[in-house]
């Protein structure tokens, strides 16, 4: 028998899971999402991607600023949910909320726990050079991503993969995984395993101060840095354009052969020397402009070999 669920999520990453659970036939009693925020040129208030999808399907949407009040708890309990599904909600759940659903609260997390607990697991996995990532369904407890694990799926991280690529792959995998987990819960067959205390790492929130590219690092580290921050906040450097140093985000790159002083442009294809080896820029973005392929950019704004990028 399908479950009665409360769904809690905010960004695009959570949308496939909401849609998959609804398509399976579960009763989505309510959707909780973060409050609307100003966005766009007019800075008008906009609901989150999850809230917009829920409204499209006529599912009640709640956007409380806190879940710690008696009123918020009473409202949450009023949904009489079998379970809550939490995907990138963006708010810590108090113990009283965790205890409210009959079968508990289940979180979809974008890492292979206990590695990369915390806010930015996708970015940190790429930036650290991890060979793989994945998604896990865990039963939530009061800790930070410390709950018992129910199911997991793994995916290889390639050199060409950006956070966007990993995000989209894990969002699809995660939706299927949560459907399977809720089906097992529905049949009282969901098995839980305690997380290991070994290999725990924390994925700190990305700070914009991390975004500047340091070409004095090894080429592989520079590539991972760029792809781990693409598209947001975007790893940046300053290109010499018309006699000025212009800040540009590099969104995609590839390993390249060649050597020179760190930051030196080695050819007319925007191959840049690093501490050892080089990278070739594939996609970049100037402030206020749309992303461009490097060859298209260079046709209008050539960067000569020998130039130095800082």
Swiss-Prot record:
Q: Could you tell me the keywords of this UniProt record? A: Protein biosynthesis, Transferase
| Protein name stated in the entry | Methionyl-tRNA formyltransferase
Question: What EC number(s) has UniProt assigned to this enzyme?
Answer: 2.1.2.9
Q: Which positions bind (6S)-5,6,7,8-tetrahydrofolate?
A: 111-114
Which gene carries the instructions for this protein? Answer: fmt
What Pfam families does UniProt report for this protein, alphabetically? Formyl_trans_C (PF02911), Formyl_trans_N (PF00551)
Q: Which family does it belong to?
A: Belongs to the Fmt family.
Name the job this protein performs. Answer: Attaches a formyl group to the free amino group of methionyl-tRNA(fMet). The formyl group appears to play a dual role in the initiator identity of N-formylmethionyl-tRNA by promoting its recognition by IF2 and preventing the misappropriation of this tRNA by the elongation apparatus.
Q: Which reaction does it catalyse?
A: L-methionyl-tRNA(fMet) + (6R)-10-formyltetrahydrofolate = N-formyl-L-methionyl-tRNA(fMet) + (6S)-5,6,7,8-tetrahydrofolate + H(+)
Q: NCBIfam families per the record?
A: fmt (TIGR00460)
Transport among keywords: no
What Gene Ontology terms describe what this protein does at the molecular function level? methionyl-tRNA formyltransferase activity
């Amino acid at each position: 028998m399908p479950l009665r669920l409360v769904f809690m999520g905010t960004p695009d990453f959570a949308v496939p899971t909401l849609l998959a659970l609804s398509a399976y036939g579960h009763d989505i009693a309510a959707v909780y999402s973060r409050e609307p925020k100003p966005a766009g040129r007019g800075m008008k208030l906009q609901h989150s991607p999850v809230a917009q999808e829920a409204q499209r399907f006529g599912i009640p949407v709640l956007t409380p600023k806190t879940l710690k009040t008696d009123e918020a708890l009473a409202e949450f309990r009023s949904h009489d949910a079998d379970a809550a599904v939490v995907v990138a909600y963006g708010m810590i759940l108090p113990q009283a909320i965790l205890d409210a659903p009959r079968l508990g609260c289940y979180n979809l997390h974008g890492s292979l726990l206990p590695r990369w607990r915390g806010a930015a697991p996708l970015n940190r996995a790429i930036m650290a050079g991890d060979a793989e990532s994945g998604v896990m369904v865990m039963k939530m407890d009061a800790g930070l991503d410390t709950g018992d694990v129910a199911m997991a799926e793994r995916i290889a991280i390639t050199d060409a993969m950006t956070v966007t690529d990993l995000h989209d792959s894990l969002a699809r995998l995660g939706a299927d995984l949560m459907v399977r987990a809720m089906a097992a819960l529905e049949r009282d067959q969901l098995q839980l395993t305690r997380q290991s205390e070994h290999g725990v790492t924390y994925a700190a929130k990305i700070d914009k101060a991390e975004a500047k590219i340091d070409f004095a690092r090894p080429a592989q580290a520079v590539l991972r840095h760029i792809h781990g921050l693409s598209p947001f906040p975007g790893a940046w450097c300053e290109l010499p354009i018309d006699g000025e140093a212009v800040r540009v985000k590099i969104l995609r790159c590839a390993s390249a052969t060649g050597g020179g002083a760190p930051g030196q442009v080695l050819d007319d294809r925007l191959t840049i020397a690093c501490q050892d080896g080089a990278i070739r820029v594939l996609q970049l973005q100037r402030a206020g402009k749309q992303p461009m392929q490097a060859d298209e950019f260079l046709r209008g704004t050539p960067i000569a070999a020998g130039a130095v990028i800082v």
